[in-house]
Amino acid sequence: SYTVRGYQCAESTAADGLTADFVYVENALPVDLLNVKGKIVLVNGFLRVPLYRSLMEAGAAAVVTMDGDIHDDLENTDLHQRKLRSALRTFGNAPAVQLRTVDAMEIVNKGASRAKVTVQNKNITLTSHNVIAEIKGTEHPEQIISFGAHYDSVEFSKGVYDNGAGSVI
């Protein structure tokens, strides 16, 4: 059993999960995708449009991506939260999770051929706020300096230097 983090907005599995054949396709070249239909597919990296489109067109039942590197300090790092954005979902929606790179290496090295993925997402719509400031020039009032920031929080924020930390400088 491995710790994974589900992609936001990805399809949920049944409550008891999805069990299927498992395959590692590394960078998902066309030749690697010939026999992925109905399988849980592990790819190297995270999801971008060309990769996700190829996986959906090939019929992947679920997608597993890697996060971090083999030297991550497990006590002080966590899996990033990724989102299956609408640009990706236009090609289909499948359960999608990510796991640590070190765990992915172990799974591949063990020659895993079956896997079970359990994802239970609840998609909700919330309101986010932005901060916009405008300073007019004193000598040239037609000239301005403007600032903007989103006022919702993001994980792993470094404080006020990330404009998603709920602070504006």
Description of each model-found segment:
Residues S1, T65-M66, D72-K83:
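Protein/peptide-recognition domains central to ubiquitin and immune signaling
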Residues S1-K37:
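Noncatalytic luminal/extracellular "stalk/propeptide" segments of secretory-pathway proteins
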Residues Y24, I40-V43, A62-T65, A96-Q98, ...:
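Structural recognition of the beta-strand scaffold that forms the well-ordered cores
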Residues A28-P30, I132-H140:
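Short beta-strand-to-loop junctions in surface cap/lid or active-site-entrance loops
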Residues G45-F46, V131, Q143, F147-I169:
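Alpha-helical metal-binding/catalytic segments enriched in His/Glu/Asp
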Residues V49-S54, H71-D78, E155-S157:
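Extracytoplasmic/secreted cell-surface and envelope-processing proteins
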Residues M56-G59:
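Non-catalytic positions within long, well-ordered alpha-helices that form the structural scaffold/packing
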Residues N93-H129:
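Long, well-ordered, tryptophan-enriched scaffold segments
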